[in-house]
Amino acid sequence: MMDIREIQAALPHRYPMLLVDRVLEVSDDHIVAIKNVTINEPFFNGHFPHYPVMPGVLIMEALAQTAGVLELSKEENKGKLVFYAGMDKVKFKKQVVPGDQLVMTATFIKRRGTIAVVEARAEVDGKLAASGTLTFACGQ
């Protein structure tokens, strides 16, 4: 488990772009984290004022940050940066709205040098909200 201070020590992101609130579990190749979605998120001012929905690209960013925490929590990667390199097979299945708790999982499926590929899922109340295959590079 990791609290927000430990997450901030791993990731360079800060408000309003830090999209991981807590890590529930982490192993060598798998992580489970949460994002508590509130009406106070700045993106709800424009997406959409009368029908607030979390933008799908920000759900994918939250998943990428979750995978980033997994990669950057490894001793050999401390102090490095993770760069988003691609997304494939992305699907959005459920709207994410204020009051939802996004449960995010990422599992490494392939690694070659500094490039890693993860399967990522975001769920709300046990139902799939979004999923995809994310590629990223770990650099200096």
Swiss-Prot record:
One of its GO terms (molecular function) is (3R)-hydroxyacyl-[acyl-carrier-protein] dehydratase activity. Gene3D superfamilies: Hotdog Thioesterase. GO terms for cellular component: cytoplasm; membrane. It is found in: Cytoplasm. Transmembrane segments: none annotated. InterPro entries: FabA_FabZ, FabZ, HotDog_dom_sf. It catalyses: a (3R)-hydroxyacyl-[ACP] = a (2E)-enoyl-[ACP] + H2O. It comes from the Bacteria. Belongs to the thioester dehydratase family. FabZ subfamily. This is 3-hydroxyacyl-[acyl-carrier-protein] dehydratase FabZ. The gene is fabZ.
